[in-house]
C-alpha cells in the first residue's frame, strides 16, 4: 500500500518564497523547529525508500477495515516521517487520520499540527492548527488550516509567516488565504496585512509572490523616494512573463511635482547566442517645465553571435530633450551621461582575417554642433604571423562615408589602407620590435558651403611610418624599510618616424587630440581618427620599476616617461592644433603602491617641463583594513578643460572623501563629499546608513548634488531658471522573505552618486 499524501506534503517547502541567498541564511539566522529532527537511515535503496514503516506502542487491525495505532505512532517512508499520539487507517476508503502531538517532517521542512485528515485515493490532505518551519532557512509561520489539493497545490487559511526569530518578530505577514501553485511555482495572497513591531502598517488586498526562481506574471514590490526636484515618488512595477524567451516589465512612477512617468522594458532571447532589450519611457505634460512638454526616451540594444564566425551589435537611444537624464531617473543612462550612441555593426571573423560593417551616429546633449555620422564604415583586417623570415604581415583598411544632418556641412568618403611588416623579438630579458608601415588615405569631399572652399575635392595622402620599440628587464633582490623585495627595473624606449604631408585640404570628421598619459607616450598617434596624422621624428624614453614582496604580490609600481622631439611637427603650424611646437612632451608619471597592509596610494601627474605647468594631477589615498571597510581621499586637477555646456575653458580642482564603515555587526555607514576648490562650493554630498538584521534591512540616505543643466530644446525654460542643485532623501526597506533576498549591499551605495567609487590601484596581484 502506498500512502500518496506523503509525497504531496513534500510540496510544502514552496510555501512562501524561493530559497534565500547564502548570505541571508547564515548559521546565526537559522531558525530550528522546537521538535527534534528524525534522522533517516542512510544508504537505503530505492525499493527501501518506497517502503512504508509503521511503529507504535499498540495497534489493532482487522483485514479490510480500520487499523488503529496508539502511543508514539511513527509512519516513515524514505526521509518523510509522521509522528502522532494516535492514527487511524480506514483500509476500505483509504482515509487516514492522525492527531495528538502531530509532527510531519521530511528533508525540507517540519510541520506540527493538531490533526491530519488525508484521502489517499484522491491525494488530498488537510492539517489543522499547523505550524511550519523550513529547514536551513528562516521561514516559519502558522496556519489555521493547511490543505493539499488533488493537483498537489497548497491552500493555507488564516495564515502568517515571517523570517524573524520567534523571540523578536520584527515583521509578520498575515493573510486570509495563500494559494501555492506547485506547477507554476507561484503564490497568490489575499487580504494580506503587514505588521511591523506588531503594528499594522500596510494592507494588500491581493498580491503574488514567486516561490522559486521561475519567472511569473504579477506585480512586484513598490518603491518610494522623495527629492526637491521631483517631489514624492512612488512606483509599482508589473512583470509579464510572456514566454520563456520574452518578458516585459511595466513601471508606472508617479511624481508629485511632475506627473505620471511610465517605464517599459521588453527583454528577449533570439536563439542560443543573441539577446536584446527595448526600453520605452514617457512622461506626459511635465509640470515642472514651462509649457508642460511631453518627455520620452526609447532605446534598443541587441548583441550576439550567429554561428561561430558572425557577430552582431546594435544600440540606439533617443530622448526628447537635453536635460532628460539630468531630470529623470532613467533605466538606460546615468544623470552625468551627455552622449547618445547609435551603433549598428555586423562582423565576420576568421583566424587570419576579419571584416565588419558599421553605422554610427552620436548625439551630444547640450551642444549645437553635431558630430558626423558614419553611414556606413567597412573594415577589413588581415594578419599573418611569421609571414616570411620571422616577419609578421598585417593589413588594416577601412572605407567610411561621413554624412551630416545639416545640408550645408561638407561630407566625405574616406578610404584608408595600411600594410605593415613587423619583426618581433621577445625573451625573458626583454623585447625588441621593429615595424614598417605605409598609410595610404584617399578622400572624396563634397563642399556644401562656401566656407569649405579651402578643402580639396579629392585628396590622396601617402605617409610612411617607422616604429622601433624595445624594453629590457632587470631584476634584483633588495631590502627596503626592513622588508625584503624583488625589484624589477624595466627601461623602455621607442623611436617613431612618421612622414609629413600637407593635410590642410582635409576636413575634420572623426579626429581629436589624445591624452598624454604614460602609456600614451608610446602610441604611434597624437590623434584619434585618421583625418590628421601628425608627422613625427621623436624618441620616447620611459622606465618602470616594480617591487614584489615575499608572496610575489606586487607592492609598488612606478612609471616615468617623456617624448623628445627630434624635429618640430609641421602639422601644428598649418592647423593650429598644437599650441606651440616644443622640444619635449609632458613628463608623465604614475605611481601605485601599497604603503602598508591597510594603506594604498595611487597618483598620476602630467607636467610640462617647457612651461613649468601642471597639466593634470590625480591622487587617491585608500585605507582598507578589511573587505567591508573603506576610507578614500582623492584630489584631481585638470586645467583648461573644455566645458561642453558653455564652450568655455575651465580649471577643475576638486577634492573628495569617501567612506564605508560598519558601526557594529548590524549597522553600516556610507558617505562621500566632493568639493570644488575653484568655486569654493560642495558639488556632491551623499550619506547613507543601513541597518540589517536576520529578517529585514533598511537604508536611509541623503544626497545633495550639482546638476549639469543645458538649455532646454523643449518648452520655454531657460538654463538660468533651472535648479543648480538637487537634494533628496531615500528610504529603502527589504523584508527578507517578502520579495527581497538581502542584504542591501554596500557596493551600490558607493556608486550611488555623480562620482562612482573606483579602486585606484592596478597592481598585478
Curated annotation (Swiss-Prot):
| Superkingdom per UniProt | Bacteria
Q: Which HAMAP family match?
A: LPS_assembly_LptD
Principal subcellular localization: membrane
**Species lineage, top-down?**
Bacteria, Pseudomonadati, Pseudomonadota, Gammaproteobacteria, Alteromonadales
Its protein name is: LPS-assembly protein LptD
Report keywords, A-Z: Cell outer membrane, Membrane, Signal
Into which family does the record put it? Belongs to the LptD family.
The residue range of the signal peptide is 1-18
Amino acid at each position: 500500500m502506498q500512502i500518496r499524501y506523503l509525497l504531496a506534503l513534500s510540496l510544502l517547502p514552496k510555501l512562501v518564497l524561493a530559497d534565500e541567498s547564502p548570505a541571508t541564511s547564515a548559521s546565526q539566522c537559522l531558525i530550528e523547529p522546537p521538535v527534534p529532527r528524525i534522522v533517516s537511515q542512510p544508504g537505503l535503496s530505492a525499493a527501501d525508500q518506497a517502503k512504508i514503516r509503521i511503529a507504535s506502542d499498540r495497534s489493532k487491525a482487522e483485514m479490510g477495515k480500520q487499523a488503529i495505532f496508539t502511543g508514539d505512532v511513527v509512519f516513515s517512508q524514505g526521509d518523510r516521517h509522521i509522528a502522532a499520539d494516535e492514527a487511524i487507517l480506514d483500509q476500505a476508503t483509504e482515509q487516514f487520520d492522525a492527531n495528538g502531538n502531530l509532527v510531519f517532517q521530511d528533508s525540507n521542512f517540519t510541520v506540527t499540527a493538531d490533526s491530519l485528515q488525508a484521502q489517499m485515493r484522491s491525494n488530498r490532505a488537510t492539517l489543522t492548527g499547523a505550524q511550519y518551519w523550513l529547514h536551513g532557512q528562516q521561514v516559519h509561520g502558522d496556519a489555521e488550516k493547511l490543505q493539499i489539493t488533488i493537483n498537489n497545490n497548497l491552500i493555507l487559511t488564516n495564515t502568517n509567516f515571517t523570517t524573524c526569530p520567534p523571540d523578536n518578530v520584527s515583521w509578520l505577514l498575515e493573510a486570509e488565504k495563500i494559494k501555492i501553485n506547485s506547477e507554476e511555482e507561484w503564490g497568490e495572497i489575499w487580504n494580506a496585512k503587514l505588521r511591523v513591531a506588531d503594528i499594522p502598517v500596510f494592507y494588500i488586498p491581493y498580491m503574488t509572490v514567486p516561490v522559486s526562481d521561475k519567472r511569473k506574471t504579477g506585480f512586484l514590490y513598490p518603491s518610494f523616494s522623495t527629492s526637491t526636484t521631483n517631489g514624492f515618488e512612488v512606483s509599482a512595477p508589473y512583470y509579464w512573463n510572456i514566454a520563456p524567451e520574452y518578458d516585459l516589465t511595466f513601471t508606472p512612477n508617479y511624481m508629485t511635482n511632475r506627473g505620471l512617468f511610465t517605464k517599459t522594458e521588453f527583454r528577449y532571447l533570439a536563439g542560443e547566442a543573441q539577446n536584446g532589450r527595448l526600453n520605452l519611457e514617457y512622461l506626459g505634460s511635465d509640470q515642472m517645465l514651462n509649457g508642460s512638454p511631453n518627455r520620452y526616451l526609447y532605446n534598443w540594444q541587441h548583441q550576439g553571435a550567429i554561428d561561430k564566425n558572425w557577430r552582431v551589435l546594435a544600440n540606439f537611444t533617443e530622448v526628447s530633450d537635453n536635460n532628460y537624464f539630468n531630470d529623470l531617473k532613467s533605466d538606460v543612462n546615468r544623470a552625468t551621461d551627455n552622449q547618445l550612441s547609435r551603433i549598428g555593426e555586423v562582423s565576420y571573423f576568421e583566424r587570419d582575417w576579419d571584416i565588419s560593417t558599421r553605422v554610427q551616429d552620436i548625439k551630444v546633449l547640450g551642444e549645437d554642433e553635431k558630430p558626423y555620422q558614419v553611414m556606413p564604415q567597412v573594415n577589413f583586417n588581415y594578419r599573418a604571423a611569421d609571414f616570411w623570415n620571422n616577419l609578421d604581415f598585417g593589413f588594416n583598411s577601412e572605407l567610411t562615408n561621413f554624412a551630416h544632418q545639416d545640408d550645408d556641412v561638407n561630407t566625405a568618403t574616406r578610404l584608408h589602407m595600411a600594410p605593415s611588416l613587423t619583426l618581433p623579438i621577445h625573451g625573458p630579458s626583454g623585447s625588441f620590435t621593429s615595424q614598417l608601415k605605409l598609410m595610404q588615405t584617399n578622400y572624396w569631399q563634397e563642399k556644401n558651403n562656401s566656407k569649405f572652399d579651402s578643402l580639396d575635392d579629392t585628396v590622396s595622402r601617402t605617409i610612411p611610418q617607422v616604429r622601433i620599440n624595445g624594453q629590457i628587464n632587470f631584476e634584483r633582490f633588495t631590502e627596503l624599510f626592513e622588508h625584503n623585495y624583488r625589484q624589477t627595473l624595466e627601461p623602455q624606449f621607442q623611436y617613431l618616424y612618421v612622414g609629413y604631408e600637407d593635410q590642410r585640404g582635409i576636413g575634420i570628421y572623426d579626429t581629436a587630440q589624445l591624452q598624454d598619459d604614460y602609456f600614451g607616450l608610446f602610441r604611434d598617434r597624437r590623434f584619434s581618427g585618421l583625418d590628421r596624422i601628425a608627422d613625427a621624428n621623436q624618441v620616447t624614453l620611459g622606465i618602470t620599476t616594480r617591487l614584489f614582496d615575499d608572496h610575489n604580490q606586487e607592492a609598488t609600481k612606478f612609471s616615468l616617461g617623456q617624448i623628445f622631439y627630434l624635429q618640430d611637427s609641421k602639422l601644428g603650424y598649418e592647423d593650429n592644433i598644437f599650441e606651440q611646437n616644443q622640444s619635449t612632451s609632458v613628463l608623465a608619471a604614475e605611481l601605485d603602491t601599497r604603503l602598508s597592509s591597510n594603506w594604498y596610494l595611487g597618483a598620476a601627474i602630467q607636467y610640462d617641463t617647457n612651461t613649468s605647468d601642471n597639466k593634470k594631477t590625480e591622487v587617491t589615498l585608500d585605507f582598507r583594513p578589511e573587505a567591508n571597510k573603506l576610507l578614500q581621499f582623492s584630489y584631481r586637477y585638470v586645467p583648461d578643460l573644455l566645458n561642453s555646456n558653455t564652450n568655455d575653458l575651465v580649471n577643475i580642482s576638486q577634492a573628495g572623501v569617501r567612506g564605508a564603515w560598519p558601526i557594529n555587526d548590524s549597522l553600516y555607514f556610507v558617505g562621500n563629499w566632493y568639493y570644488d576648490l575653484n568655486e569654493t562650493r560642495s558639488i556632491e554630498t551623499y550619506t547613507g546608513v543601513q541597518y540589517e538584521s536576520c529578517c529585514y534591512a533598511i537604508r536611509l540616505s541623503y544626497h545633495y548634488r550639482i546638476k549639469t543643466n543645458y538649455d532646454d530644446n523643449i518648452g520655454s525654460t531657460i538654463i538660468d531658471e533651472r535648479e543648480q542643485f538637487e537634494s533628496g532623501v531615500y528610504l529603502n526597506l527589504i523584508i527578507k522573505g517578502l520579495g527581497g533576498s538581502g542584504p542591501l549591499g554596500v557596493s551600490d551605495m558607493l556608486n550611488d552618486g555623480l562620482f562612482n567609487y573606483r579602486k585606484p590601484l592596478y597592481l598585478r596581484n
